[in-house]
A protein has these predicted regions:
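Contiguous, structured surface segment used for ligand recognition
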Residues: 3-140, 470, 485-519
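Feature activates predominantly on carbohydrate-active enzymes
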Residues: 75-307, 348, 352, 452, ...
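Active-site neighborhood of glycoside hydrolase catalytic domains
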Residues: 257, 271-273, 277-373, 380-388
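Exposed aromatic-hydrophobic patches
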Residues: 571, 622-628
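Short beta-strand-plus-loop segments that form exposed binding edges in beta-rich domains
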Residues: 636-644
């Protein structure tokens, strides 16, 4: 039942029932008065489908209507915050939230059961009877969007918020300041937008070290920001703003040069026109801290979020190391080096945010020189930094670049660039299947550390996303995989089932005109003729053992550790050979002459499946020879340990 329904995230518990419910223009919504905002959103969606006004009745759920959707609350439900129960029966749909956010999550599940295209071709739709009990695994289910490198209209951001809600994501991390542009209006410092919001040029697609010579920029007014915050809040999404400091600050320093390190040689700040990391960082002056506190005061007034993100990443120390004043601060404060100066800088900001009853979030570089005790660390680099924060008792949000950076290519780079320079990405490779396979809790060693992992977040860095269509292409459908790993516990995940459901959800994307990518499906993990293959070795990434005997030139098995004596790969044929055959096994990668090839091993065969006879020794990573009719199995046996891992391209029998 679950596999046939386009539900992403998959509900934790879904049970099929007898019968169905017919939703039509005659269906009314009966709701608890605390759910009036959520009811209005649902009613609007149904009206778009039916083409007629939806009747909504706030009668505290006392009188059941003949055809209805009932929205209720029950804090006693044995579910996590944000959980809900949903029943579809012949007389109607009932959604009961543990809290208001849970009721809204249930509404999103209902909307995914409705037709994608609006208005409906028919005047009604039949929904299968079912029972759902559902709750989120993580409280932080986030998407990040960089509006510093490129600026996007507020109406597009609202559509993005809608899609986040549809996927039950609940944190929008809004990256608002960068070396290449300052995007948030600050009343006290108007030059931040008059100067900092505009750059003189932008690298064109296909030439990262060139300029298009076109002035570029834009910013969000405080009124626009208030509107977006309210829009997101109505959809149970918290907007966490990011104001970068002490680095990625060139645009701000270009607007107000006095807050940079003015005593260094060649000081000449400007809004940057190239991507990458730039040296301009805020000076550790008292005037700078007052400047930043003034900015953050206005930010806190605009954003009710408990969390304020201060960046903290990729802050070069070269200017501090050149600055006489910065060195004097280090000496005065007893700081050993510029790393500790960054920690001092972050702690000053943390203390200020605490005075505003806000909590600091920063990228994992904020631990350099010492991690503030109450800070939440957003992990994007090596997972060892997550372990470091967990050891110290800090909370973390997992946002690893290898698994959650949606600015990476999602299909082979050659294939993408063959379609045009506008398909350029920063690099990397993150297909849907790889993102789906990520477990945010993999770094936790015990339940205490698991609770310190607040959740997971996908990142959209936009150097190579000049317009909204490109943002959509990079975000969809990978956002669906992100949503499921943020909502479901690991033991409930199943990629094959997810992939079936994704086809249904992509119909919603298409109906809305979203410029989605075509997901890259991994090769099926099966042998070419139904033979059984097994190994004593771990598997690296998605390079399954079946790929050693699948008949495809573009797949291979890759072991995930060093080899030990008596490690093996054993192929048990579907049926015995009927004639003499020649067997060849080729190992080794292309990275180097000796890369991941078998140095010491034997190729063996068996007629009875248990007695093994040597065919040949491996030499330069290859073994071949003839085996007799009636052979039932082949084996690659490691005869000596080796530090290289092992790649097996294909076991051929001819």
């Amino acid at each position: 039942m679950a596999q046939s329904l386009p539900l992403i995230p998959q509900p934790k518990v879904l049970q099929k029932q007898e019968g169905s419910f017919v939703l039509s223009a005659a269906t009314a919504i009966r709701f608890d008065r605390q759910l009036s905002v959520e009811t209005a959103i649902l009613a609007d969606k149904i009206e778009r489908l039916t083409g007629e006004k939806t009747r909504s009745v706030a009668e505290e759920l006392r009188i059941m209507l003949s055809s209805e959707i009932a929205l209720d609350l029950d804090s006693s439900l044995a579910l996590k915050p944000g959980g809900y129960e949903m029943t579809v029966a012949p007389r109607g749909v009932k959604i009961t939230g543990k809290d208001v956010a849970g009721a809204f999550a249930g509404i999103q599940t209902l909307l995914q059961l409705l037709p994608a295209a609006a208005p409906m071709a028919e005047k009604s739709v039949s929904l299968p009877a079912l029972k759902i009990s559902d709750e989120p695994e993580y409280g932080w289910r986030g998407m990040h969007l960089d509006c510093g490198r490129h600026f996007y209209p507020i109406e597009e951001l609202k559509k993005f918020i809608d899609q986040m809600a549809f996927h039950k994501l609940n944190v929008f991390h809004w990256h608002l300041t960068e070396d290449q542009g300052w995007r948030i209006e600050i009343k006290k410092y108007p030059k931040l937008t008059a100067v900092g919001a505009f750059r003189d040029s932008t690298p064109p697609y296909g030439n990262r070290n060139s300029d298009d010579g076109k002035r570029y920029g834009g910013f969000y007014t405080q009124e626009q920001i208030k509107q977006l915050v309210a829009y997101a809040s109505a959809r149970h999404i918290t907007i966490v703003p990011e104001i970068e400091l002490p680095g990625h600050a060139a645009a701000a320093i270009a607007a107000y040069p006095q807050f940079g390190n003015t005593d260094i040689p060649g000081y000449n700040p400007k809004v940057m026109t190239r991507w990458g990391v730039h040296p301009y960082v805020f000076a550790p002056k008292e005037e700078t801290f007052r400047f930043l506190e003034d900015i953050l005061t206005e930010v806190c007034d605009l954003f009710p979020s408990k969390f304020i993100h201060i960046g903290g990443d990729e802050a070069p120390k070269s200017q501090w190391n050149q600055s006489k004043f910065a060195k004097e601060v280090m000496q005065r404060e007893g700081l050993k080096n510029a790393d500790e100066l960054q920690s001092y800088f972050i702690r000053r900001i943390e203390k200020f945010l605490a005075s505003k009853n806000r909590s600091l979030v920063g990228w994992d570089e904020i631990q350099e020189g010492g991690l503030p005790k109450s800070a939440t660390m957003m992990v994007w680099r090596d997972l060892k930094w997550a372990q470091h924060a967990l050891d110290l008792g800090n909370n973390v949000v997992m946002a690893p670049n290898a698994y959650a950076y949606l600015d990476h290519y999602q299909r082979p780079v050659g294939e993408e660039l063959s379609k045009g320079a506008e398909f350029e990405a920063i690099g990397g490779f993150l297909p849907v299947s790889k993102l789906y396979g990520y477990d945010p809790a993999s770094v936790a060693r015990n339940e205490k550390e698991r609770k310190q992992i607040l959740g997971v977040q996908g990142q959209l860095w936009t150097e190579y996303m000049k317009d909204w269509k490109k943002v959509e292409y990079m975000a969809f459908p990978r956002i669906a995989a992100l949503a499921e790993i943020a909502w479901l516990p690991k033991d409930k995940k199943n990629y094959e089932d997810f992939r079936v459901r994704l086809d249904g959800v992509m119909k919603f994307y298409d109906a809305l005109g979203i410029n989605r990518a075509v997901p890259l499906d991994p090769p099926q993990k099966k042998t070419k003729d139904g033979s059984v293959i097994e190994t004593s070795l771990n598997v690296h990434a998605d390079h399954a053992i079946e790929f050693a005997y699948d008949g495809r030139a573009n797949t291979f098995f890759w072991a995930g550790r060093e080899l030990k004596k008596d490690d093996h790969i054993t192929l048990r044929l579907k049926s015995p050979l009927t004639a003499v055959a020649r067997v060849t096994v080729q190992t080794g990668g292309k990275a180097s002459q000796n890369g991941d090839r078998l140095e010491k091993g034997e190729l063996q065969y068996s007629v009875d499946g248990s007695t093994w006879i040597k065919v040949a020794d491996f030499s330069e990573g290859k073994a071949s020879g003839s085996i007799p009719a009636q052979s039932k199995a082949l084996r690659v046996l490691v005869t000596a340990p080796q530090k290289f891992w092992l790649i097996v391209h294909e076991m051929t029998i001819e």
